[in-house]
Amino acid sequence: MPLIPDSIQSIGVFHVDDPFNPMPDPGDADPETVAFAFFIGIAVVFSLLLITLVCTAAYLVCTSSYEGEYDEELANNGDGSRRGILNFRPLFGKKNSNGLLLDSNFTNPGEFDDNEEFIEREREALIKMSPFEVDSYMRAKEFQIVSPPAVQEFGTYLDSKDLQMIKDRGIQSYYFIPSINDNVDKSGHFLPSFLVQDKLEVEFTRWNKSSSAVLNYPLPYNKKDAVYFEVKVYNHKPNSNSIFSIGLVTVPYPYFRIPGMCKFSIAYESTGKLRINDPFFPSTLLPKLVEGDVVGFGYRFKTGTIFITHNGKKLMDVTQNVSVELFIALGAMNASYTRTYTKDGLLEDPDNIELRNALAEGRELKLSKDIQNPHNPMDETKWDIIDSDEIELHVNLGQTGFVFIEANVKKYGFGSVFGEIGIPPAYNPNDIQKDKLIQKGEELPPQYPEDTENFGLFGNLKIKSHIKNPLKEVSSNPSAPELIQKKLKTPIVKTPKVGIYEFTTPIDRKRETNMQPSINPPVYEINDTRQSSPEITNETISNEETVSSSSKAEPALQHGQSNKTPNKRQNKKTKQRKNKKKGKKNK
């Protein structure tokens, strides 16, 4: 048997031919060693995860404390700003790689540096502006000092009456406030900058210089993830001398400035600019708007994010951590009065710094006269006023379908179209023809019966009285006159017929003698004699004679006197007189 080298023995390898040293079974390895190695690997992984979590928590704690110090510093400013303004810091923007606008104060400069930077930027911008732009900027600045914007927490602007109105009427309660601009002609006639049609359709007129239309109510809480609205460019010429902007503002907002140019406002300009509290020269980040485009704005409640859509596609998230009351605003401005825009539209490269510097320094350039010498509507000597091209914008709050599909699926509209009151009645002629109740109007008034004696002109009416009428029992009997006479024990006077009717009247002797009003008024019955008329007999004539003679024999009552003689004594005297007369005749 050959000898096995020591190197081979050290690693436990044996020849197969050796019957005394067979190959060891690999399954015979120690299981405790394997389990120990497995647990060591798991411990290493969990330790790495724990270290990562600890580092993340430390970073978040440091960042939150840093932000708290920053908020406290801003809250202690001397400008009288409220705590709600702190939620609007992301509206001063620079764009990161993800398309989200971050705070321009991301490096947290001091208060003095911010003021100095703003003053320097304002000085450079005012030199490049036209007289109309400078005047509008100074007026807006003074306007917001006198009437500061109401930066309130979201959901605190409306009172109970407004909330009830929105609940009852739904989207029908929203409308744009009419124009209050101060445009007048030489005669003093009011020239509106824009007209509001059907509550949510705004048309900027040819008299518009620069104005904004603001919605009456802020963005509502619709109990969804977000609230969303869209604006369609219904009328806008390709080479228009007017520009418009669509956005969100706080109130009160300067009515002579378009959205995005004043504090606490954001707007999508038709030139492709995204204006966020920027009255100077913002960057062009969005596509230009033409006739037929649809622009959408959305606000997410949890994160306070505002996002923008264009023709149904989401472009970017603009801000975050916004929790103030915002109102929809539409604005338009005549570009003929500005130095940045031309009458034929926006310059090809509006962000060209060299071009702006050349305009500011007054160099001789081959530019149009509208750029070198913009029109000035405030010059009373020239009356240099250019008609503005009309612009029409339609707002959709959810009364119709959105172009943005997500808003339709998740129901991001402003709420119910007609509220809890419901839809008003329709006055369509086609619907009226199908209405069975309205079609029955041709058969009205109904045909009343001709028998007015039993039915009456106004129907078979019965009147209940609290006074008992002794004639009630005999009023329905055809032999009423005889029964009335027995009931009242008074004779009935029959007057001659007048036409085809005959009147019978009961006489109350007691009432005549005492001159006292009767509790129960006399009843007059009308007997229809068209079929048969009663005959006049000798008894009726004799009764009439006795009644007439007795009435003549009664003495006339004087004023303040009453006849105290009973009726029976008068009857006896009359009988005695008649008997005496008959006795004399017989003699």
Swiss-Prot record:
It comes from the Eukaryota. Belongs to the SSH4 family. One of its GO terms (molecular function) is ubiquitin-like ligase-substrate adaptor activity. The gene is SSH4. It is found in: Vacuole membrane; Endosome membrane. This is Protein SSH4. One of its GO terms (cellular component) is vacuolar membrane. Gene3D superfamilies: 2.60.120.920. The lineage of its organism: Eukaryota, Fungi, Dikarya, Ascomycota, Saccharomycotina. Residues 162-349 form the B30.2/SPRY domain. Residues 566-587 have a biased composition (Basic residues). The keyword Glycoprotein applies. It is a single-pass type II membrane protein. The chain crosses the membrane at residues 34-54.
